[in-house]
Structure formats: structure tokens, C-alpha cells
Amino acid sequence: MLQGISNIFIMRLKFAFLLLTFCVLMLSCTDKKPVSQAQGISIGQKESTPVKRVNSVEVAKQKPLTYKILVPTAYRYCNPDTLINKNWVELYKDGKDYYVGKARYSIKIISDECGDGSAPKLLGKRNTILFVNQLPIRLGKVQAANIEISDTSYLVPGTTYSFTFLGKRYKLEAKAQGEDVFINYALLLNGERFFREVEAGDACFNFLFAGDLDGDSKLDLVLSAPTDYENLRIFMFLSSCAPPGLQIGKAAEIVDDFSC
């Protein structure tokens, strides 16, 4: 029995180490050249290899914009205090409108009974959706798509949004196989797959924002896609980071875990 407990403890330590490394890599992997899997693709990028899918992209970068993101929540493996600073901006909602402004935040230490006893919690001073280290857009009101976004509007398979944004028609679809556990879960934009999860559990995924974040009058997305209810995983997709032949590409990702 003691041997079994010891093995479980060792496995949890290994998981914690891997998650910590993953968190850091997701925030810094855009520094690598060339970029694979569309992470941190730059504006003004040069095409190196024609592709059709996001998960097979290789792009040579020229003066890249490296994106890092955080959301207002408690963290166990990521330390927001070493990442965010006064130069960051935030996407926030005021009434029905969305704005980008200078980041206004605070960090406090809270108790964490399942972790090391304490954890940093990043707090926004407004109705903050996302903190970003930089965005190629002027501060102020941003254009948002007219689709329903809420904490309970989950992207279950079969969900479809059809809308017009800044003169262009878009169709967002969620597809998957299976019922209790979704297999090959995918999100498509105008028929092009930009997100895929081999096994998505009950797929409690939802959009946090849909609109223009990079100033090119094209659709950008912020997606919450946790692997389970005790997991944090947020993606930022930008049209300016789209691989050749696609309309949107992953610009940044943040992952953390608060399971016991």
C-alpha cells in the first residue's frame, strides 16, 4: 500500500513538472525559428511551405510579434507576477461593448489547499476578459461580432454561428463524433478547421470574444477550451497569424491546472 501511495505521489510530481514546463513553453515558444503548429506566427510573415491545416504549418518569421496572454484567475503552475507588467494591455467589456486599454490589475496570494498551500491570483480592475503583452491595434473600443457569448454558451457538437462581421460573412461550426465522450472534436471557420481535440470529454468549450483584435478588419477569436473542469486553457486566434491558405491561426495559449 505504501508503495502504491509513493507511486501516486511521484506521478503527481512528474505531472506538476510537465505542466509547469508546458505553461512556460506555451508563453515562449514563439521565440523559436521556424515556427511549427502555428504558434506565435508573425505579422508580415514569409511563406515557406504551402499548407492546408494549422497543425502542419512551418513559417519563417520576419520581425515577429510574440504574444503572451493571461486571464484573471488563480494560478498554480504559472506565476503571473513574473509575466505581466505595466506595458501589457487588456481586453475588457463595458456594458455591451468591448475595449482594449492599458492593463489595470493586482496580484494577491490566496490559500491553495490542494497545492503548496498558497497561490497567486491575478485580478482585473475592470470586467477583464484577457491580458495580452501587446496588440497591434489602437487603444479604445474594438469591433465585436454579433454572436451570443456567455459562460453557459458552450460549443457542443452541432453548434453553428452564422453572421456578418465588417462586411464579410462567417460560419463557425463545432463538430465531433460520439455522445458521452466527444472524439475528434473540431472547430471550423467557413469550413476550415482551426482547432482540433482528439478527445474532448464533455466539451465545455466556449468563446470569450469574437471580433477584431489586430486591426485588420477580420475576425479574431479568444477560446476557452479546458480539458476538464479543473483545468485552465485559453487560446487567442488572430487573422494576422493565419497560416497560408487559412483565415485564422493560433497566436497564444495559456494552460494551468488546479485539480486536487
Where are these regions (language model features)?
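Positively charged n-region of N-terminal signal peptides that target proteins for export
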Residues: 2-3, 8-15
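Generic alpha-helix detector with strongest preference for long hydrophobic helices that associate
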Residues: 10, 17, 199-203, 218
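Beta-propeller-forming repeat regions
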Residues: 33-211, 224-260
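Sec-dependent N-terminal signal peptides
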Residues: 15-24
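C-terminal motif of bacterial Sec signal peptides marking the signal peptidase cleavage site
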Residues: 27-28
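Acidic/hydrophobic-patterned starts of short beta strands in beta-sheet-rich repeat architectures
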Residues: 215-225
